Amino acid sequence: MTKIVRSKYKASRRLGVSLWGDSKDAFNTRNYRPGQHGQNTMIKTSDYGLHLKAKQRLKCHYGRVTEKQFRNIFALAQKMKGNTGENFIGLLESRLDTVVYRMNIAPTIFAARQLVSHGHIKLNGKKADIASIRLKEGDVIEVKESVKQIPLIQESVSKQAQTTPGYLSFDVPSLTGKYLRVPALSDVPYPFEAEVHLVIELYSR
Protein backbone atom coordinates (compact mmCIF):
# COMPACT_ATOMS: atom_id res chain seq x y z
CA MET A 1 0.00 0.00 0.00
CA THR A 2 2.92 2.36 0.74
CA LYS A 3 4.13 1.95 -2.84
CA ILE A 4 0.65 2.87 -4.14
CA VAL A 5 0.52 5.96 -1.91
CA ARG A 6 3.91 7.21 -3.11
CA SER A 7 2.97 6.51 -6.71
CA LYS A 8 -0.34 8.37 -6.48
CA TYR A 9 1.27 11.46 -4.95
CA LYS A 10 3.85 11.42 -7.73
CA ALA A 11 0.98 11.29 -10.25
CA SER A 12 -0.49 14.46 -8.72
CA ARG A 13 2.78 16.32 -9.24
CA ARG A 14 3.22 14.93 -12.75
CA LEU A 15 -0.29 16.02 -13.77
CA GLY A 16 -0.16 19.38 -12.00
CA VAL A 17 -3.16 18.99 -9.66
CA SER A 18 -4.05 17.37 -6.36
CA LEU A 19 -5.91 14.40 -7.80
CA TRP A 20 -7.77 13.43 -4.62
CA GLY A 21 -7.65 16.55 -2.45
CA ASP A 22 -5.55 14.74 0.15
CA SER A 23 -3.85 16.99 2.72
CA LYS A 24 -0.84 14.62 2.65
CA ASP A 25 -0.41 15.06 -1.10
CA ALA A 26 3.11 16.27 -1.89
CA PHE A 27 1.61 18.50 -4.60
CA ASN A 28 0.43 20.85 -1.85
CA THR A 29 4.03 21.77 -1.02
CA ARG A 30 5.78 20.91 -4.30
CA ASN A 31 3.32 21.92 -6.99
CA TYR A 32 5.63 21.16 -9.89
CA ARG A 33 6.48 18.05 -11.84
CA PRO A 34 8.87 15.49 -10.32
CA GLY A 35 12.34 15.19 -11.79
CA GLN A 36 15.35 17.38 -12.53
CA HIS A 37 13.44 19.83 -14.74
CA GLY A 38 10.20 19.79 -12.79
CA GLN A 39 10.29 23.50 -11.91
CA ASN A 40 10.91 24.62 -15.49
CA THR A 41 7.83 26.73 -16.29
CA MET A 42 8.99 27.47 -19.85
CA ILE A 43 7.98 24.08 -21.23
CA LYS A 44 5.04 24.55 -23.60
CA THR A 45 2.24 22.02 -23.82
CA SER A 46 0.72 21.21 -27.20
CA ASP A 47 -3.03 21.12 -27.84
CA TYR A 48 -2.86 17.33 -27.86
CA GLY A 49 -0.88 17.44 -24.62
CA LEU A 50 -3.61 19.49 -22.94
CA HIS A 51 -6.26 17.01 -24.04
CA LEU A 52 -4.13 14.06 -22.93
CA LYS A 53 -3.47 15.60 -19.52
CA ALA A 54 -7.20 16.21 -18.97
CA LYS A 55 -7.85 12.54 -19.71
CA GLN A 56 -5.02 11.34 -17.49
CA ARG A 57 -6.22 13.47 -14.57
CA LEU A 58 -9.75 12.11 -14.79
CA LYS A 59 -8.63 8.51 -15.27
CA CYS A 60 -6.13 8.66 -12.40
CA HIS A 61 -8.78 10.10 -10.09
CA TYR A 62 -10.69 6.81 -10.40
CA GLY A 63 -7.72 4.72 -9.32
CA ARG A 64 -6.67 1.60 -11.14
CA VAL A 65 -9.02 1.91 -14.09
CA THR A 66 -7.13 0.75 -17.17
CA GLU A 67 -7.07 2.68 -20.43
CA LYS A 68 -9.14 -0.07 -22.06
CA GLN A 69 -11.77 0.11 -19.31
CA PHE A 70 -11.84 3.90 -19.49
CA ARG A 71 -12.33 3.86 -23.27
CA ASN A 72 -15.04 1.22 -22.99
CA ILE A 73 -16.90 3.34 -20.44
CA PHE A 74 -16.65 6.30 -22.80
CA ALA A 75 -17.90 4.20 -25.72
CA LEU A 76 -20.91 3.16 -23.66
CA ALA A 77 -21.57 6.80 -22.73
CA GLN A 78 -21.58 7.71 -26.44
CA LYS A 79 -24.26 5.11 -27.16
CA MET A 80 -26.55 6.35 -24.40
CA LYS A 81 -29.18 9.03 -24.92
CA GLY A 82 -28.36 12.52 -23.73
CA ASN A 83 -25.09 14.38 -23.17
CA THR A 84 -22.02 12.18 -23.63
CA GLY A 85 -19.98 13.99 -20.97
CA GLU A 86 -22.71 13.74 -18.35
CA ASN A 87 -23.27 10.08 -19.26
CA PHE A 88 -19.54 9.40 -18.95
CA ILE A 89 -19.33 10.90 -15.46
CA GLY A 90 -22.53 9.13 -14.44
CA LEU A 91 -21.05 5.77 -15.43
CA LEU A 92 -17.78 6.43 -13.60
CA GLU A 93 -19.62 7.57 -10.48
CA SER A 94 -21.89 4.52 -10.44
CA ARG A 95 -19.00 2.06 -10.08
CA LEU A 96 -19.09 0.22 -6.76
CA ASP A 97 -15.55 1.19 -5.75
CA THR A 98 -16.27 4.85 -6.55
CA VAL A 99 -19.43 4.85 -4.44
CA VAL A 100 -17.59 3.23 -1.50
CA TYR A 101 -14.99 6.01 -1.79
CA ARG A 102 -17.55 8.83 -2.10
CA MET A 103 -19.34 7.56 1.01
CA ASN A 104 -16.01 7.76 2.87
CA ILE A 105 -16.14 4.10 3.82
CA ALA A 106 -12.53 4.10 2.62
CA PRO A 107 -10.05 7.00 2.73
CA THR A 108 -8.83 6.52 -0.85
CA ILE A 109 -10.16 5.11 -4.10
CA PHE A 110 -7.42 2.46 -3.87
CA ALA A 111 -8.53 1.37 -0.39
CA ALA A 112 -12.14 1.33 -1.61
CA ARG A 113 -11.19 -1.05 -4.41
CA GLN A 114 -9.42 -3.33 -1.92
CA LEU A 115 -12.41 -3.42 0.42
CA VAL A 116 -14.59 -4.46 -2.49
CA SER A 117 -12.18 -7.02 -3.95
CA HIS A 118 -11.67 -8.62 -0.51
CA GLY A 119 -15.41 -9.15 -0.19
CA HIS A 120 -15.99 -6.68 2.65
CA ILE A 121 -18.88 -4.86 0.95
CA LYS A 122 -22.47 -6.02 0.44
CA LEU A 123 -24.71 -4.82 -2.37
CA ASN A 124 -28.43 -5.23 -1.71
CA GLY A 125 -27.64 -7.75 1.02
CA LYS A 126 -25.26 -9.91 -1.02
CA LYS A 127 -21.46 -9.95 -1.14
CA ALA A 128 -20.11 -7.90 -4.03
CA ASP A 129 -16.42 -8.24 -4.86
CA ILE A 130 -16.18 -6.69 -8.33
CA ALA A 131 -15.12 -3.04 -8.24
CA SER A 132 -16.63 -2.19 -11.61
CA ILE A 133 -20.19 -3.30 -10.76
CA ARG A 134 -22.52 -0.50 -11.88
CA LEU A 135 -25.06 0.60 -9.30
CA LYS A 136 -28.65 1.54 -10.06
CA GLU A 137 -30.82 4.10 -8.31
CA GLY A 138 -31.99 2.73 -4.98
CA ASP A 139 -29.18 0.20 -4.59
CA VAL A 140 -28.03 -0.25 -0.98
CA ILE A 141 -24.45 -0.96 0.04
CA GLU A 142 -23.26 -1.93 3.47
CA VAL A 143 -20.04 -2.88 5.21
CA LYS A 144 -19.90 -6.51 6.35
CA GLU A 145 -20.37 -6.90 10.10
CA SER A 146 -17.01 -8.63 10.54
CA VAL A 147 -14.99 -5.59 9.39
CA LYS A 148 -17.08 -2.66 10.66
CA GLN A 149 -14.69 -1.89 13.49
CA ILE A 150 -11.40 -1.89 11.60
CA PRO A 151 -9.52 1.43 12.06
CA LEU A 152 -9.30 2.21 8.33
CA ILE A 153 -13.10 2.25 8.02
CA GLN A 154 -13.82 3.92 11.37
CA GLU A 155 -11.33 6.74 10.77
CA SER A 156 -12.64 7.30 7.27
CA VAL A 157 -16.36 7.42 8.08
CA SER A 158 -15.71 9.90 10.89
CA LYS A 159 -15.25 12.48 8.11
CA GLN A 160 -18.36 11.54 6.13
CA ALA A 161 -20.86 14.04 7.54
CA GLN A 162 -19.18 16.96 5.79
CA THR A 163 -18.38 15.36 2.48
CA THR A 164 -20.98 12.82 1.31
CA PRO A 165 -22.32 14.19 -2.02
CA GLY A 166 -26.04 14.73 -2.47
CA TYR A 167 -26.57 11.83 -4.87
CA LEU A 168 -25.73 9.39 -2.07
CA SER A 169 -27.00 8.85 1.46
CA PHE A 170 -25.04 7.22 4.26
CA ASP A 171 -25.89 6.18 7.82
CA VAL A 172 -22.78 6.16 10.01
CA PRO A 173 -24.02 3.93 12.88
CA SER A 174 -25.03 1.09 10.55
CA LEU A 175 -22.38 1.78 7.88
CA THR A 176 -25.10 1.51 5.27
CA GLY A 177 -25.60 3.78 2.29
CA LYS A 178 -27.84 4.20 -0.72
CA TYR A 179 -27.16 5.24 -4.30
CA LEU A 180 -29.94 7.80 -4.78
CA ARG A 181 -29.48 8.98 -8.35
CA VAL A 182 -27.07 9.39 -11.23
CA PRO A 183 -25.07 12.56 -10.58
CA ALA A 184 -24.48 15.43 -12.95
CA LEU A 185 -20.91 16.60 -13.51
CA SER A 186 -21.56 19.61 -11.27
CA ASP A 187 -22.55 17.29 -8.39
CA VAL A 188 -19.26 15.42 -8.24
CA PRO A 189 -16.74 16.71 -5.65
CA TYR A 190 -13.63 16.70 -7.80
CA PRO A 191 -10.70 18.49 -6.10
CA PHE A 192 -9.61 19.81 -9.51
CA GLU A 193 -11.35 21.08 -12.63
CA ALA A 194 -12.54 18.01 -14.52
CA GLU A 195 -12.26 19.08 -18.16
CA VAL A 196 -14.54 16.39 -19.51
CA HIS A 197 -15.06 18.25 -22.79
CA LEU A 198 -11.35 17.81 -23.55
CA VAL A 199 -11.59 14.07 -22.86
CA ILE A 200 -14.54 13.84 -25.26
CA GLU A 201 -12.61 15.72 -27.94
CA LEU A 202 -9.57 13.46 -27.45
CA TYR A 203 -11.54 10.22 -27.75
CA SER A 204 -13.60 11.55 -30.66
CA ARG A 205 -10.58 12.19 -32.89
UniProtKB/Swiss-Prot annotation:
Q: Coding gene?
A: rpsD
The keyword Ribonucleoprotein belongs to this UniProt entry's keyword annotation: yes
Extract the NCBIfam families matched here.
Answer: PRK05327.1, rpsD_bact
What organism, scientifically named, is this protein from?
Rickettsia felis (strain ATCC VR-1525 / URRWXCal2)
Q: Name the job this protein performs.
A: One of the primary rRNA binding proteins, it binds directly to 16S rRNA where it nucleates assembly of the body of the 30S subunit. With S5 and S12 plays an important role in translational accuracy.
Transmembrane region(s): none
User: One Pfam family this chain carries?
Assistant: S4
- What Gene3D superfamilies is this protein classified in? Ribosomal Protein S4 Delta 41, Chain A, domain 1 (1.10.1050.10), RNA-binding S4 domain (3.10.290.10)
> What does the record note on quaternary structure?
Part of the 30S ribosomal subunit. Contacts protein S5. The interaction surface between S4 and S5 is involved in control of translational fidelity.
Quick one: a GO cellular component term?
A: small ribosomal subunit
Record family assignment: Belongs to the universal ribosomal protein uS4 family.
Against SMART domains, the record matches this protein to: Ribosomal_S4 (SM01390), S4 (SM00363)
Note the PROSITE patterns from the entry: RIBOSOMAL_S4, S4
Task: Give the molecular function GO annotations.
Answer: rRNA binding; structural constituent of ribosome
Q: What is this protein called?
A: Small ribosomal subunit protein uS4
UniProt GO BP: ribosomal small subunit biogenesis; translation
Q: Which residues form the S4 RNA-binding domain?
A: 94-157
Keyword set, alphabetical order: Ribonucleoprotein, Ribosomal protein, RNA-binding, rRNA-binding
